[in-house]
């Protein structure tokens, strides 16, 4: 099994935006390899507390070892960050001074063939962040109708060939039985997309695999719920920082942040505010922060990363 290694994206930029301080309480909603978590703990020494969330038991076990030296300053929760509100209440934590969400699939999950996230190696078509619960990608591929499958691939993968891919998948499972492996699905996608339409730098199955992963793990729904929970729990002056990796995630982050920063929601035709809503956060990143060329050269995952941040008023 691959070692749970992970290069943290834009570590200096993230730390500057989160601005952890001694005595603060911070949430890392996507603990992963604990790279960002370790930096937060070091910056908030000697008594800052970190609550780390991950629904992947392998990630949680590896992270536990990597930050064990910080002792009782660490609380680990095996859960999706969308359940942050309930989990913090259980821990007796009322407010937090910051939260970080580093979205998407980790390099370890991609490199561990049996998890089924990668289209490069043959493996069971799984894609669950928590490999012990919920539907797999194979369940969706083999049970959904062509229309339902096309909708998922189109909406979550932004794939222009979604209808054709779904049609090929349904035809393949009808003729040859269930699609159970990653490369079986890759063959369907390659067959559906005309060779002339393949993009030079993107594998033809990239968007389909992204779409299924998002659907299997309810990534977009979890993101919105987690953002709301995090912002609601922030103390005045506390900060929320999010690293997204594709336009669907970034759109949700931008929308939620703007909603909390907007304040008044009255129609423009009204002469004065009657709703009474006040801005609850200040947006710290007018435009998303992007990785520099040097970082992208050493960590290609950073190429598509966008960082946005807010501060609670």
Curated annotation (Swiss-Prot):
Annotated binding of S-adenosyl-L-methionine, by residue: 34-36, 54, 81, 102, 109
Keyword annotations of the record:
Cytoplasm, Methyltransferase, rRNA processing, S-adenosyl-L-methionine, Transferase
Keyword match Metal-binding: no
Gene Ontology cellular-component annotations? cytoplasm
User: Which cysteine pairs make disulfide bonds?
Assistant: none
Query: Main localisation, per the record?
Result: cytoplasm
Q: Name one Pfam family in it.
A: Methyltransf_5
Q: Which GO terms describe its biological process?
A: rRNA base methylation
The kind of enzyme this is, by top-level EC class, is transferase
Q: What is its EC number?
A: 2.1.1.199
Localization (cell): Cytoplasm
Q: Which PANTHER family match?
A: 12S RRNA N4-METHYLCYTIDINE METHYLTRANSFERASE, S-ADENOSYL-METHYLTRANSFERASE MRAW
| Known role | Specifically methylates the N4 position of cytidine in position 1402 (C1402) of 16S rRNA.
**UniProt name for this protein:** Ribosomal RNA small subunit methyltransferase H
Protein species of origin = Geobacter metallireducens (strain ATCC 53774 / DSM 7210 / GS-15)
Encoding gene, per UniProt annotation: rsmH
